[in-house]
Design a protein with these regions (language model features):
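Single conserved hydrophobic/aromatic residue that forms the stacking wall/gate
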Residues: 1-7, 12
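Extracytoplasmic/periplasmic, Sec-exported soluble proteins
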Residues: 3, 37-41, 83, 98-106, ...
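A conserved hydrophobic position in a structured secondary element of the catalytic/binding core
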Residues: 6, 60, 115
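Ligand-binding pocket segment of bilobal, Venus flytrap-like solute-binding proteins
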Residues: 13-81
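Short loop segments at secondary-structure junctions
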Residues: 14, 95-98
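Solvent-exposed loop/turn segments at secondary-structure junctions
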Residues: 63-66, 84-86, 97-99
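Small-molecule pocket liners
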Residues: 87-91
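Extracellular/periplasmic juxtamembrane helices and adjacent flexible linkers that interface
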Residues: 98-178
Length: 178
């Protein structure tokens, strides 16, 4: 979510032609200064906000926000930024495991199914943004189709992004420790 916030701020700063690293860090520092609880993950943050009623604003992944809204329709409002980051959970067949368990064919079929239109619709029903454009358009009432979605490639890939933002002494440490 840190990358998403920087991405959003970068777009704002680009409009003013004042997109310096210091300005981005300043923005994030001000934001984090208002954080009353910093949970270790998305589910914990959602639980803290929605069920324990701690905090004024929850910055969450889209699926978490949609799930919360479905569970508490009259209590919350989703405010969607104009820019966010496309989060794509990794899936893989682990060769050693499927060989030992003799499940190679089943695992491969499951992996292939995940990208089918049927599976994309099931995922969309649970708040996960479909990657299939046709299916995404079927859910235009649920997902904001105008949002600009950056990818990790826009930030130099995972190795580069991790080094800059999350390594010891990176942006997160610098902002969090100040």
């Amino acid at each position: 979510i840190l990358r998403c916030l920087v991405g959003s701020e970068m777009c704002i700063r680009d409009r003013d032609k004042n997109n310096s690293e210091d300005k981005q860090k300043e923005f994030l520092g001000k934001l984090y200064a208002n954080v009353s609880v910093l949970d270790s993950g998305a589910r914990g943050s959602t639980t803290t906000f929605v069920e324990n009623k701690k905090g004024d604003v929850l910055i969450a992944w889209e699926n978490e926000a949609l799930t919360s809204l479905a569970s508490y329709p009259d209590e919350y409002e989703i405010v969607t930024p104009s820019v966010s980051i496309l989060a794509q959970p990794s899936v893989a067949v682990v060769d050693d495991n499927v060989k030992v368990n003799k499940t190679e064919e089943l695992a491969s079929e499951y992996l292939s199914f995940l990208y089918s239109k049927q599976a994309q619709r099931i995922a969309a029903d649970y708040g996960y943004r479909p990657t299939d454009e046709e299916v995404l358009n079927e859910y235009s009432g649920k997902f904001n189709l105008t949002i600009k979605l950056d990818t990790i490639a826009d930030y130099g890939g995972w190795t580069q992004a991790y080094k800059i933002y999350f390594d010891d002494g990176g942006w997160f440490d610098e902002i969090y420790n100040n």
